């Protein structure tokens, strides 16, 4: 592997920790050191490590066979659970990552509208080929993107009769955990409706912040929503869904059906783990409890004079990269850039311990 790496974000000079085991909110590295996990696998680890309910579901699915090459009983369970949570998702299709979900949603928008132009935002991250930090990436999905300023309502003026879709995170994740202003997001909703373009909310990270995602908190209904991360129960997962008239374009019984392939779109283990997590573990009350912990952590950090952004259980620490290794030595793991995503096993005592350790490092 080039540089010993197959996932760029995990590279931390001089070398990253190699984690060999996880249980609850704790992880252990190859040298036997123990850490409290405040990274939460960049929001994918919402359930913590080795949750017994999800483990049991995976074991049962594994015993029944995995590569069946056919529809399976778990995919309908997971589809029903997700559609039941998100009123804007009338129909859904599964894929293998948030990246894939966003590529498919954009491709659907272009096919449905017959237009090409796509509006995105500085700081937006929608996957490995949809990266819009500081001018974007040479590996980006080839399309005529127009990049606007996040949280600037005037960016809605970029939407015109040539626009197929606007793709936006209701809160920037990789771009600093910056909540979207409602006025900004509503302006995008109004502009897309006025010009016949589609509004796509990337809730790959943010769907965990409310039972109906941030779109429910904001009371703004997108045409399409993309999902990923924790919804696969800790296994590789992506999904996109939305308005029935749009998603029905993938109905294979139609003579004009749009193709959507993928060997592992309905991978048995992922479908089983995802369904178990959503129907047996995650509840609105648990989301609220974890969000309250995140709010508490932000308050504790802000009291130290550190800028702490985010919403609920997602927290962004700014300008504290210099204390990262010290925090590791104190037993706290999170992203070097300051990204924190809490998991369900964490407690108020754990959160207070993180804040105290940060205070000691900053002293």
Q: What does each model-found stretch correspond to?
A:
Residues 1-363:
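Conserved N-terminal phosphate-binding loop of PLP-dependent enzymes in the Aspartate aminotransferase
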């Amino acid at each position: 592997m080039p540089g010993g790496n197959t996932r760029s974000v995990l590279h931390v000079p001089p070398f990253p920790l190699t984690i060999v085991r996880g249980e609850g909110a704790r992880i252990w590295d190859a040298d036997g050191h123990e850490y409290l996990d405040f990274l939460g696998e960049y929001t994918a680890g919402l359930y913590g490590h080795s949750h017994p309910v999800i483990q049991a579901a995976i074991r049962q699915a594994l015993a029944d066979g995995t590569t069946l090459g056919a529809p399976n009983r778990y995919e309908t369970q997971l589809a029903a659970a997700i559609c039941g949570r998100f009123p804007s998702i009338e129909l859904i299709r599964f894929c293998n990552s948030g990246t894939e979900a966003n590529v498919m949603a954009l491709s659907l928008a272009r096919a449905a509208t017959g237009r090409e132009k796509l509006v995105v935002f500085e700081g937006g991250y929608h996957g490995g080929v949809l990266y819009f930090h500081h001018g974007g990436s040479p590996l980006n999905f080839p399309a005529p993107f127009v990049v606007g300023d996040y949280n600037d309502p005037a960016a809605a003026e970029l939407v015109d009769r040539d626009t197929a879709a606007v793709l936006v995170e209701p809160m920037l994740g990789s771009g600093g955990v910056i909540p979207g202003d409602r006025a900004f997001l509503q302006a995008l909703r109004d502009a897309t409706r006025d010009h016949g373009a589609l509004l796509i909310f990337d809730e790959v990270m943010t769907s965990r912040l409310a039972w109906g995602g941030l779109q429910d908190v904001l009371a703004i209904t997108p045409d399409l929503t993309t999902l990923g991360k924790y919804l696969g129960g800790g296994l590789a997962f992506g999904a996109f869904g939305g308005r029935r008239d749009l998603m029905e374009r993938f109905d294979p019984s139609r003579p004009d059906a749009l193709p959507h392939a993928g060997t592992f779109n309905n991978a048995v283990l992922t479908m089983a783990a995802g369904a178990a997590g959503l129907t047996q573990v995650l509840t609105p009350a648990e989301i609220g409890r974890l969000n309250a912990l995140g709010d508490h952590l932000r308050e504790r950090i802000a009291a130290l004079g550190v800028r702490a952004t985010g919403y609920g259980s997602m927290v962004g620490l700014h300008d504290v990269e210099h204390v990262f290794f010290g925090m590791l030595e104190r037993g706290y793991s999170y992203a070097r850039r300051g990204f924190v995503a809490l998991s369900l096993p964490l407690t108020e005592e754990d959160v207070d311990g993180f804040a105290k350790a940060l205070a000691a490092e900053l002293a």
